[in-house]
């Protein structure tokens, strides 16, 4: 091996070896245990960022570790290639989304290869190709025929600038999260898939996902939002249809003083027809739709419709208000309001001078006071007629029974989860395979006419989707009759909901080859950001159950283990421009002065301007604080970047990018390289004779095997990769100081270095591959992970600490099996101990076996 560690030449050579030998290409093998490791595939935005590098490094470390465990490891990669950024880039660059996307894929593919990730490139695909989305289209038509797909007109958040529908969570302060344009409400027909039919199963099966972070499971439970309650009817004066409401607190029914309805509720629309003031308020509510998460903090507003609802049990009339906090998407779009026992209702009632009637008091008999705030705990009913004195569950059951007997309500289970709206009014997505004939009937496109191909040679004007603008494209036939194609495209979550399964058989002449899919699935380890907890991860679980029920897969869940990696942070700097706005400056263009504690005192950019330090924040284009992985690989090599990524922080925590840390990782790799070079340069070593080792040699070998045990557990079970690397570094410090005089010294070092190189392989595969060969071994890619020798861990001797009156006074080295009596005797005779015991009377001697001798004397 070369004396100097030169990653640039080395890495290229080894990557070529992997390519030439198809090292990571796998097929099904019934005789081998499989391991399917998958990192969430990238959107081809143009360049990899450090978030990508972290995600894919973790995946590669897990894959290579499992490979050395002797498993048949599949690690595929592909491209989540549809989506709005491609359209925006196409408009900006006066091109079509397709060529922009394919160029980016080519560039990013080369970047991934330079980082040395062990992918099976034979399985690569891009979701924007007809070969991929054709099967998605066919599966959608099968779901339609099963009654799991429907079309309905629904009110959507519409961004007039992007000309697209936004999910509730993409609306921030009433504006589009992407371009900050005020969002409008618009009613359009859309396609939905009935995820609600699977709500209970999606909820129940979370209990079986032992390998998932609790936080993600909790987020999904809350998103699905199962509740048990009562659906009841309030008659409305002058209306034929009653007002349906759902409540989880029927025990508070006698405290209802008004009913709130959503601005989109039919009653609100009807009431506003002859009431211009109400009509204006309804319009205001519709156009300031907010994410559900913001409901709690926003100002509560309402307006009396003039309608009166009749209480179903006591007949009292209560006003019906349009309220901005009632969402049409959730429940029935109407709520019964009990100001005495719900804080939101309380604030609203106080603001509009509505009655507040308490009907629940504390179970312990303490005083009830609802003058300042609602009493929201469960308690005992009073002023509730026949239900007085009942506790929550008794009251729940009794009131539900009475409502049911009178035909005014029933117990029901409700889910917060809504059906999945999969229509998007964009061009760059998979066409929805439906047609409408002249008689208005809607039909799925027959399988033999699929795929419905998205034309790629288009001109983007930035306003209208080319397939909506091109009237000819929509014209088709169905059973010989003229028909019009659907011009909406699928939500891009459709493609990412089943891509993991397509990797199992990417060339299959169907959505999946069941035999291959059932060999590989479920995914053993999935890696990606926690921001996908409620959308992508839930949709993928749903899609997997659809594939199961269609007979393609036998498992219930797609991902056994889930690791959510933390974000990558970097220093961010800015100066204030003439207009008072922030201009962000790249950290690489900033010179920093630090104080004695390492804190930034002053920062000057390359134009000589003093800039403000905004702290360590997520790397992003908008803050100009991204670090280009390419530059780091060119400067230090891929192995160094990978090692830093895995060492700088626990995988699930944020990682603070510090180039000094990258330099540290590089120095460490050079030290390992240097020691291997020095060792191998002295020629071959003789076999290690473990029976003739000296005490020091045994101690060093014990450290080697303790490290193997720890690293194996840290990578394989705990996934604390940073502590695994720290343990290897600690061992290297000892190996650097170890004597190399005798043949057995060198034989022991040989065993130790082979273990170090193999343990570093998942993180630094190129350097490890070369050092492994230099150590006289062949093909590290198919080697076996080092195993620790139980006998080496057995200690012949132990160090016992001697404490006198709580202070450390001596250390004893004794045989590992020394008796308490022997240790006491040695401790009391120890020279140091005797010095401190001189003239004192020993009152007590406490022995903690194998660790401590504590002497109390005065």
From Swiss-Prot:
EC number of this enzyme: 6.1.1.4
BP GO terms, sorted: leucyl-tRNA aminoacylation
Pfam assignment, any one: tRNA-synt_1_2
Entries under InterPro entries matching the protein: aa-tRNA-synth_I_CS (IPR001412), aa-tRNA-synth_Ia (IPR002300), Leu-tRNA-ligase (IPR002302), Leu_tRNA-synth_edit (IPR025709), M/V/L/I-tRNA-synth_anticd-bd (IPR013155), Methionyl/Leucyl_tRNA_Synth (IPR015413), Rossmann-like_a/b/a_fold (IPR014729), tRNAsynth_Ia_anticodon-bd (IPR009080)
One function term, GO molecular function aspect: aminoacyl-tRNA deacylase activity
Annotated catalysed reactions: tRNA(Leu) + L-leucine + ATP = L-leucyl-tRNA(Leu) + AMP + diphosphate
Keyword annotations: Aminoacyl-tRNA synthetase, ATP-binding, Cytoplasm, Ligase, Nucleotide-binding, Protein biosynthesis
Example of a GO cellular component annotation carried by this entry: cytosol
UniProt keyword Aminoacyl-tRNA synthetase, yes or no: yes
Residues that, per the record, bind ATP: 621
Motif, 'KMSKS' region: chain positions: 618-622
Cellular localisation: Cytoplasm
Motif ('HIGH' region): 42-52
Family statement drawn from the similarity comment of this UniProt entry: Belongs to the class-I aminoacyl-tRNA synthetase family.
Record's protein name: Leucine--tRNA ligase
Lineage of the organism: Bacteria, Pseudomonadati, Pseudomonadota, Gammaproteobacteria, Vibrionales
Gene designation per UniProt: leuS
């Amino acid at each position: 091996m070369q004396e100097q560690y030169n990653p640039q030449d080395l890495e290229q050579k080894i990557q070529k070896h992997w390519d030439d030998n198809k090292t990571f290409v796998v097929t099904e093998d019934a005789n081998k245990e499989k391991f399917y490791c998958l990192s969430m595939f990238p959107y081809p935005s143009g360049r990899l960022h450090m978030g990508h590098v972290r995600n894919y490094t973790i995946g590669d470390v897990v894959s290579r570790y499992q490979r050395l465990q002797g498993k048949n490891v599949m690690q595929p990669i592909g491209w989540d290639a549809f989506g709005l950024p491609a359209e925006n880039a196409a408009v900006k660059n006066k091109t079509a989304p397709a060529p922009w996307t394919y160029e980016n894929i080519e560039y990013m593919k080369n970047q991934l290869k330079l980082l040395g990730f062990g992918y099976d490139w034979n399985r690569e695909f891009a979701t924007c190709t007809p070969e991929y989305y054709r099967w998605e289209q066919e599966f959608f038509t099968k779901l339609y025929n099963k009654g799991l797909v429907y079309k309905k007109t629904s009110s959507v958040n519409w961004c007039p600038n992007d000309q697209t529908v936004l999910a509730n969570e993409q609306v921030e302060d009433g504006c589009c999260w992407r371009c900050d344009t005020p969002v409008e409400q618009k009613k359009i027909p859309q396609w939905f898939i009935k995820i609600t039919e699977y709500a209970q199963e999606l909820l129940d099966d979370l209990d079986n996902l032992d390998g998932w972070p609790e936080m993600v499971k909790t987020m999904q439970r809350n998103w699905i939002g199962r509740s048990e309650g009562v659906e009841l009817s309030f008659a409305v004066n002058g209306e034929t249809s009653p007002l349906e409401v759902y409540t989880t607190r029927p025990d508070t029914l006698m405290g209802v003083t008004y009913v709130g309805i959503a601005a989109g509720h039919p009653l609100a629309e009807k009431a506003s027809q002859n009431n211009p003031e109400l009509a204006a308020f309804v319009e205001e509510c519709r156009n300031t739709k907010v994410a559900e998460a913001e409901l709690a903090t926003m100002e509560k507003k309402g307006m009396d419709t003039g309608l009166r609802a009749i209480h179903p049990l006591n007949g009292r009339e209560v006003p019906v208000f349009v309220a901005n906090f009632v969402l049409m998407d959730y429940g029935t779009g109407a709520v019964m309001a009990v100001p005495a026992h719900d804080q939101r209702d309380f604030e609203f009632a106080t603001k509009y001078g509505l009655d507040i009637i308490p009907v629940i008091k504390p179970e312990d008999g303490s005083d009830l006071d609802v003058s300042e705030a609602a009493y929201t705990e469960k308690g005992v009913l009073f002023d509730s007629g026949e239900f007085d004195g009942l506790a929550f569950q008794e009251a729940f059951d009794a009131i539900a029974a009475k409502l049911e007997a009178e035909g005014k309500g029933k117990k029901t289970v409700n889910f917060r989860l809504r059906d999945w709206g999969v229509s998007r009014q964009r061009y760059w997505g998979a066409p929805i395979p439906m047609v409408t004939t002249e008689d208005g009937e809607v039909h799925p496109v027959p399988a033999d006419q699929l795929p419905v191909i998205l034309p790629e040679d288009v001109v983007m004007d930035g306003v209208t989707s080319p397939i909506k603008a091109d009237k000819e494209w929509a014209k088709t036939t169905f059973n010989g009759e003229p028909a019009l194609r659907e011009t909406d495209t699928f939500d891009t979550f459709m493609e990412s909901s089943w891509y993991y399964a397509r990797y199992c058989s990417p060339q299959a002449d169907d959505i999946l080859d069941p035999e291959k899919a059932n060999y590989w699935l479920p995914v053993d380890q999935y890696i990606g950001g926690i921001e996908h907890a409620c959308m992508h991860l839930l949709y993928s679980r749903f899609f997997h159950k659809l594939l199961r029920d269609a007979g393609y897969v036998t498992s219930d869940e797609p991902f056994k283990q889930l690791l959510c990696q933390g974000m990558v942070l970097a220093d961010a700097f800015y100066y204030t421009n003439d207009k008072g706005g922030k201009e962000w400056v790249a950290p690489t263009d900033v010179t920093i002065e630090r104080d004695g504690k390492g804190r930034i005192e002053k920062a000057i950019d390359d134009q000589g301007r003093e800039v403000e330090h905004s702290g360590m924040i997520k790397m992003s284009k908008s803050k100009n604080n991204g670090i280009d992985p390419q530059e780091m690989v060119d400067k230090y090599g891929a192995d160094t970047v990978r090692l830093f990524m895995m060492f700088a922080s626990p995988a699930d925590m944020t990682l603070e990018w510090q180039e000094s840390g990258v330099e540290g990782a590089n120095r460490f790799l050079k030290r390992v390289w240097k020691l291997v070079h020095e060792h191998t340069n002295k020629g071959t070593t003789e076999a290690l004779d473990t029976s003739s080792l000296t005490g020091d040699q045994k101690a060093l070998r014990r450290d080697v095997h303790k490290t193997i045990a720890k690293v194996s557990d840290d990578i394989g079970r705990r996934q604390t990769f940073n502590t695994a690397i720290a343990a290897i570094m600690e061992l290297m410090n000892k190996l650097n100081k170890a004597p190399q005089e005798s043949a057995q010294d060198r034989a022991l070092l040989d065993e130790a270095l082979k273990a170090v190189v193999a343990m570093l392989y998942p993180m630094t595969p190129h350097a490890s591959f070369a050092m492994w060969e230099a150590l006289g071994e062949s093909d590290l890619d198919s080697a076996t992970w080092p195993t620790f020798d139980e006998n080496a861990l057995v200690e012949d001797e132990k160090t016992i600490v001697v404490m006198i009156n709580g202070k450390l006074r001596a250390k004893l080295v004794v045989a590992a099996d020394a008796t308490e009596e022997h240790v006491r005797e040695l401790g009391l005779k120890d020279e140091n101990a005797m010095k401190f015991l001189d003239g004192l009377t020993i009152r007590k001697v406490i022995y903690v076996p194998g660790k401590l001798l504590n002497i109390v004397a005065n």
